[in-house]
């Protein structure tokens, strides 16, 4: 069996990726989230496949088909709850994974990082079109508000929005194509994940110290397979607790009402994992400006590798950068809170200040702090 594992063309790839892979001996639990994301993707694809067997992408029957899944299909309620809350777990792991990359300087593996940002955007697109499918009030109005942002693009905006809609508003054609996108995108994500891992295995993993770990590597199996299994147990515990005890706690009550184009909900908001970007979008009174800020809030990740000014890779030994990182984390939590609040004072001004601080931290303060840290590291005698 050992020989087959090392010689068989397919087994050899698996062996080099998950068994005999040399891994740094000191990587912490923050390195668990990559494998957890892979498991989240598998859970989402499997539960989504079973949901697609019973779902109908038609404006007249979409809402009823979701109710039918929850009431009449064997364990349909469980599959649906796992899928809906699995998305929340997916984004939780994604944010922690990206945060780890920023904290420990993993972004210096530029190819891996760039593919990761593309993956983040693709997952966000998948989650957005997926949220529209139950065809509840928030599904419909969320789709209307976000797709309507395309009309802010000069000259071609209105045409582009109508092209996406397949008509003059969000309707049957929109729902059908969103279902098609929601079905195909996870498989595109799987392909991108393989490319992401391919680039990662070219360089090997980073580690908390940020120092080249080549002199001290251990095999991935059994050390990190067992560590990832522990992470998986925690993930499943949280996911099952959510899905079985409070499956609707992260959703919006408005989505229990069927979509009604004649009745606008008092407060349109997205799922919690988009609220930080939604708050940035709303903080700018101009429509095009808001759209550009929304895009910039995610695409800013692409320029982080070029803003690295520190002599050290990781923030592990850089207290000022650490402080700024945790301020950024608190700021993102503030933006998430603001995104869920109505558009009125004092939430408007808090959102504007938090949005400004978000861009200032990443573009100005976090590149400047390491220059001072570099100076402090120089021997003064």
UniProtKB/Swiss-Prot annotation:
Task: Please list the residues that bind heme b b566.
Answer: 97, 196
Location of the protein in the cell: Mitochondrion inner membrane
Q: Which coarse location class applies to the principal site listed for this UniProt protein?
A: mitochondrion
| Keywords annotated in UniProt | Electron transport, Heme, Iron, Membrane, Metal-binding, Mitochondrion, Mitochondrion inner membrane, Respiratory chain, Transmembrane, Transmembrane helix, Transport, Ubiquinone
GO biological process entries = mitochondrial electron transport, ubiquinol to cytochrome c
What the record notes about the co-factor is: Binds 2 heme b groups non-covalently.
The membrane topology of this protein is: Multi-pass membrane protein
Task: List the cofactors.
Answer: heme b
Gene3D superfamilies documented for this protein: Cytochrome Bc1 Complex, Chain C
A single MF term (Gene Ontology) = ubiquinol-cytochrome-c reductase activity
Q: Which Pfam families match?
A: Cytochrom_B_C, Cytochrome_B
One GO cellular component term, please give it: respiratory chain complex III
What's the protein here called? Cytochrome b
What species is given as this protein's source?
A: Ningaui ridei (Wongai ningaui)
């Amino acid at each position: 069996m050992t020989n087959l594992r090392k010689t068989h063309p397919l087994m050899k790839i698996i062996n080099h990726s998950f068994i005999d892979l040399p891994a740094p001996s000191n990587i912490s639990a923050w390195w668990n989230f990559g494998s957890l994301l892979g498991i989240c993707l598998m859970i989402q694809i499997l539960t989504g496949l079973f949901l697609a067997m019973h779902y109908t992408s038609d404006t007249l029957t979409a809402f009823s088909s979701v109710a039918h899944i929850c009431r009449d299909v064997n364990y349909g309620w469980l599959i649906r709850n796992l899928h809906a809350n699995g998305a929340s777990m997916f984004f939780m792991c994604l944010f922690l994974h990206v945060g780890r990359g920023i904290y420990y300087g993993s972004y210096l593996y530029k190819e891996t990082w760039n593919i990761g940002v593309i993956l983040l955007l693709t997952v966000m697109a998948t989650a957005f079109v997926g949220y529209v499918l139950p065809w509840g009030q928030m599904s419909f109005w969320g789709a209307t508000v976000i797709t309507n942002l395309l009309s802010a693009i000069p000259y071609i905006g209105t045409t582009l929005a109508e092209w996406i809609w397949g008509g003059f508003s969000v309707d049957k054609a929109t729902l059908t194509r969103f279902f098609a996108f929601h079905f195909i995108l996870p498989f595109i994500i799987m392909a991108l994940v393989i490319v992401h891992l391919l680039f990662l295995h070219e360089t090997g993993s980073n580690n908390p110290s940020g120092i080249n770990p080549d002199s001290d590597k251990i095999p991935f199996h059994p050390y990190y397979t067992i560590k990832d299994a522990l992470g998986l147990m925690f993930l499943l515990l949280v996911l099952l607790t959510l899905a079985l005890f409070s499956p609707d706690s992260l959703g919006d009550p408005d989505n229990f009402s069927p979509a009604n184009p004649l009745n606008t909900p008092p407060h349109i908001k997205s799922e919690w994992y988009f609220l930080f970007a939604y708050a940035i979008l709303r903080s700018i009174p101009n429509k095009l400006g808001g759209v550009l800020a929304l895009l910039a809030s995610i695409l800013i990740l692409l320029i982080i590798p070029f803003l690295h000014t520190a002599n050290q890779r990781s923030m592990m030994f850089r207290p000022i950068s650490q402080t700024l990182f945790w301020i950024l984390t608190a700021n993102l939590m503030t933006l998430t809170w603001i995104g869920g609040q109505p558009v009125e004072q004092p939430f408007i001004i808090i959102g504007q200040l938090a949005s400004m601080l978000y861009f200032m931290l990443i573009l100005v303060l976090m590149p400047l702090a390491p220059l001072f840290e570099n100076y402090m590291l120089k021997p003064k005698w």
